[in-house]
Amino acid sequence: MNRIYLYLLIVLILAGCSSPGGRYDMSDDQAPDTPLSVEHIEDAHPQYEPYSFGGNKDYNLRGKSYRIIKNPKGFTESGKASWYGKKFHGHLTSNGEIYDMYSMTAAHKTLPIPSYVKVTNTDNGKSTVVRVNDRGPFHDGRIIDLSYAAAYKIGVVQAGTANVRIEVITVDKPTKPRPKSKNNALEYVIQVVSSQHIERVRTLAQNLGQNLSAPSFVESTNNTHRLFLGPFTDDDLTQTLLEQVKSAGYDSAFIKTINKRAK
């Protein structure tokens, strides 16, 4: 029951900028009303993740067949990138996560979900790293659909589309658990989100911490406010909480190792 409540809570928070009502109330996609500052946006952090149960089967759409790439290691592709934003914000992606136009994510027609991809805008040389968690774009010549934040960061929003090169970043499955210090000098934290809206981050920190029964704190640097859960000393517990956070819609969350804080 707590899990259902947490899921609904995150949906409401993430959908704060989307229009009310049924699915895809907007006939045309558009950027958010408030211009985005990209200084605080971090690239997706590549890490090993098992492929999702949803969104990874071969499929047919509009008379075309699409086969999911089984071994994406070394995969590269060049073509047009587009972006999607407010119309889809707060709705489900192909693997059941919640689309957040402010996260560093993307859609691809055949890469396994999730995959991490370096995207380089060959028109201006800017690049970023995104996490693929959706399917698309289904327009001839387009190879990847970027979240609004990712597109803005490399200059795709302004032009609508751009020439890009994508390269898959492969992270092998860990064969050993995370090393532990002899003196237990290391701890783990989960970075959930970063934002310039301090009150929103504080509210989320309180709600998420309560619903996951986990300590939370906010660190602020240069008007960028980062929400963390932790610190934890147990690696298995940290991994379990990370999966819960991602299931709640924060697919860009990741684990950081820190030196133990003085009591």
Swiss-Prot record:
It is a lipid-anchor. GO terms for molecular function: lytic endotransglycosylase activity; peptidoglycan binding. A lipid is attached at C17 (S-diacylglycerol cysteine). It is an enzyme of class 4 (lyase). Gene3D superfamilies: RlpA-like domain, Sporulation related repeat. A lipid is attached at C17 (N-palmitoyl cysteine). Residues 182-257 form the SPOR domain. Pfam families: DPBB_1 (PF03330), SPOR (PF05036). Its EC number is 4.2.2.-. InterPro entries: RlpA (IPR034718), RlpA-like_DPBB (IPR009009), RlpA-like_sf (IPR036908), RplA (IPR012997), SPOR-like_dom (IPR007730), SPOR-like_sf (IPR036680). Residues 1-16 form the signal peptide. It comes from the Bacteria. One of its GO terms (cellular component) is plasma membrane. It is found in: Cell membrane. Keywords: Cell membrane, Cell wall biogenesis/degradation, Lipoprotein, Lyase, Membrane, Palmitate, Signal. One of its GO terms (biological process) is cell wall organization. Lytic transglycosylase with a strong preference for naked glycan strands that lack stem peptides. Belongs to the RlpA family. NCBIfam families: rlpA (TIGR00413). This is Endolytic peptidoglycan transglycosylase RlpA. The lineage of its organism: Bacteria, Pseudomonadati, Pseudomonadota, Gammaproteobacteria, Vibrionales.
